[in-house]
Amino acid sequence: MASVQEQLDAIRSKSGARRTVGLDNTTVCQFVTNDPTLADAVNAATEEFEALNQEFPELMALGEVEQVAAIEKHLVNFYADDTVNPYVSMAARGPWIVTTKGAVLHDNGGYGMLGFGHVPEPIIEAMTKPQVMANVMTPSLSQFRLSAALEREIGQTREDGCPFTHFLAMNSGSESVSVATRMSDVNAKMLTDEGGRHAGKPVKKMSLAGGFHGRTGRPAQFSDACLTAYKTHLATFRNEHLITVEPNDVDGLKAAYARADAEGYFIEAFFMEPVMGEGNPGLAITPDFYSTARALTKEHGTILLIDSIQAGLRTTGYLALVDSPGFRDLEAPDLEAYSKALNAGQYPLSILALTPESAALYRQGIYGNTMTANPRAMDIGSAVLGMVTPEVRQNIVDRGHEFVTKLEALADELGGAITKVEGTGLLFSCELDPKFKAYGTDSTEEFMRLQGIGVIHGGDNSLRFTPHFQVTSQEVDLIIDHVRNAVLNGPQAG
């Protein structure tokens, strides 16, 4: 078989004009010697390139810009047009992507779902296993297997073990939060109906400032990070009033509940991320803030949801907040949601974990889903948890610390271009000075993508990174070097 470089040269020589340069040849050759998944990605790209040229010869002959436009012509993109990746992905293995024009990228921008990279073999094996496809209405050993795996995973560091007794399995993470809102709705009705503890009181919602809990229905109403767009365009948000509290502001949280008592309304639910994924990527909630929230929510009858959809596994190496350092002796929340790392970015799966008290709130008929707890999704969740070894957990923590330390050193080196670094495990970000445009046309994000580093913006003006769980120090240095290059040689705002 031809070498990696020869294969890439062959793809580049036969395709139209490319805009995405990707990693330089020297870098590719250096990583090929240490990471077999890069060679696997290029080998797969060569096969796919030949097949695509047979299937879509005219499309493959187009330049990269025209090719992207042709492919997306009939698709409605949820996000701004100028934040779409500037390339067409053709093959990938591990953290490596190869484009239709032969560029190689290191992917750190998979919205936190690609903890084990692209095409992880145990996950693909679980996903392709022949199944009796049905939902929770048909008992399956796959359901039993994942329930047992979740019980082993959650609470493994605690003397009292797993605090959750029941699990709901849904599709997207946002959907698991939707189910949580139904349960908090049941609780709110019970408490505000005639004879209830908060009878007749108006009902309000609370989350963290900059919090994100999904795009569907009521989860969107709890998502402060997106409220500006919703209120601008949606009639149903015209009269929405979400109470927000700054992360880790204990006094502000106490004041919010004191105001609810004074003004006579009931806070139905308090939703918070243990590590913020959108508003301030990488910022962790402190044990003191959490314990205050747990005490106040219990005192007032509010449902407390911890949204670990993006933070689970990625931030501390553990799926659940209750296993995170500083939280192991604290009382569990009523509900906790997991999704991205748990489904490996390969098949829709989210889990809502329930304590005995919160499980008792569910009422048959208030929610339903065609694919809930289907065996294929269950097996994927089990496979993921089976891949989380002690070494993987430790690497998440160690490399996360290395990333933050090296980004902070880079911030000092660059003298103000990077204004803030936040990070917990492998969810971290660096905020840029306003003279830099973080995303969109002629931005730092776009420049890094064109040069071979996949990244997605977050916060007001930050670059957000979510690398794979087995990332190495060599990869850390690659990313740091590309951030430096983007700041020094990339575009600036204006």
Please report, for each region that a protein language model flagged, where it lies by residue.
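N-terminal glycine-rich, Lys/His-bearing helix-loop that initiates the first secondary-structure elements
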Residues: M1-F164
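PLP-dependent aspartate aminotransferase-fold enzymes
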Residues: M1-V21, L114-G117, E151-M272, M276, ...
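Conserved PLP-binding catalytic core of the aspartate aminotransferase-like
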Residues: G400-V404, L414-F447, F469-T472
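Active-site PLP attachment segment
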Residues: R215-P219, F327-L361, A373-M378
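Conserved PLP phosphate-binding loop immediately N-terminal to the Schiff-base lysine helix
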Residues: E273-T286, G301-F327
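Structural motif of enzymes handling amino- and sulfur-group chemistry
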Residues: A373-N395, R399
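Conserved PLP-binding active-site segment of the aspartate aminotransferase-like
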Residues: N280, M371, C430-K435, G454-V483
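PLP-dependent enzyme catalytic core of the Aspartate aminotransferase-like
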Residues: A2-S3, A10, K14, P390, ...
